[in-house]
């Protein structure tokens, strides 16, 4: 069995009196495409925000390659050392910030496309490459020598070839058809050279042809870049076709997990999310 790239252990995320994620445990192994599905408001994007260090969980841990990178309140032996007011110290000591998690090889896309509207396709990807080298745009732009800059430009062009956007490299990002804007956002994530890619509703707003193309594209990039992928998606044909395994959450709580065949037959999943499939 391949090694774990991601593991969530008993993760809870509470906002005041609202429990967005409720004692969730899950794992993703190297090379897998795993989907996280559930109704709107089930806590899926909150899970992504916990994994990437945007949110610090109320309880639980996130592990990347078997190392804790995000932690809520301490447990076990650590609870004795860091109790009361010291619990916050433990969390600050363990939890990585989003930029540090990115440097560990994690990249994500968002439900709402976040491209630089005034930049070309090429520039959007080039900026993503720059940001992996230094901490801000200013230093990324002005501290590269000519040789490094030229190599980044070559790498950017090569990536655009791989993802099928070379012909559009000089077009403004916002001038692209919607499906290609989604592809560009994924290309920006790939520019950071991740080993673990999180896709938040990549098929949102796509027509059937674009969705079919996206399905093939995700398969291709997994193979080409040796990726492990976790995705949130409401498009069930895509989910069932592409996923090695599926986790289903409802009101932040895990209600089922397994292969697509198992999930499609699970009564709790049908009742909560998929709906009743009528006999033909």
Segments from the language model and where they lie:
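Glycine-rich phosphate-binding loops of nucleotide-dependent enzymes
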Residues: 2-280
């Amino acid at each position: 069995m391949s090694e774990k790239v991601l593991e969530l252990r008993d993760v809870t995320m509470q906002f005041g009196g609202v429990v967005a994620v409720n004692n969730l445990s899950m794992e993703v192994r190297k090379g897998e495409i795993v989907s996280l599905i559930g109704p709107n408001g089930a806590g899926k994007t909150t899970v992504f925000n916990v994994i990437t260090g945007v949110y610090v969980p109320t309880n639980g841990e996130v592990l990347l390659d078997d190392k804790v990178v995000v932690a809520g309140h301490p447990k076990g032996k650590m609870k004795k050392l860091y109790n009361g007011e010291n619990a916050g110290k433990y969390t600050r000591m363990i939890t990585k910030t989003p930029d540090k998690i990115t440097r560990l090889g994690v990249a994500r896309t968002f439900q709402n496309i976040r491209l630089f509207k005034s930049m070309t396709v090429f520039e959007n990807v080039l900026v993503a490459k720059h940001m992996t080298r230094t901490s801000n745009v200013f230093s990324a732009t002005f501290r590269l020598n000519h040789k490094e800059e030229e190599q980044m430009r070559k790498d950017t062009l090569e990536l655009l070839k791989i993802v099928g956007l070379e012909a559009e490299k000089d077009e403004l990002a916002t001038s692209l058809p919607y499906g290609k804007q989604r592809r560009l956002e994924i290309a920006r994530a790939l520019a950071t050279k991740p080993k673990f890619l999180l896709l938040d509703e990549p098929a949102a707003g796509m027509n059937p042809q674009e969705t079919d193309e996206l399905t093939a594209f995700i398969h291709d990039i997994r193979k080409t870049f040796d990726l492990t992928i976790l995705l949130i998606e409401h498009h069930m044909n895509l989910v069932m076709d592409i996923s090695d395994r599926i986790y289903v959450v409802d009101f932040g709580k895990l209600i089922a997990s397994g292969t697509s065949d198992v999930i499609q037959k699970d009564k709790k999943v049908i009742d909560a999310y998929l709906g009743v499939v009528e006999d033909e």
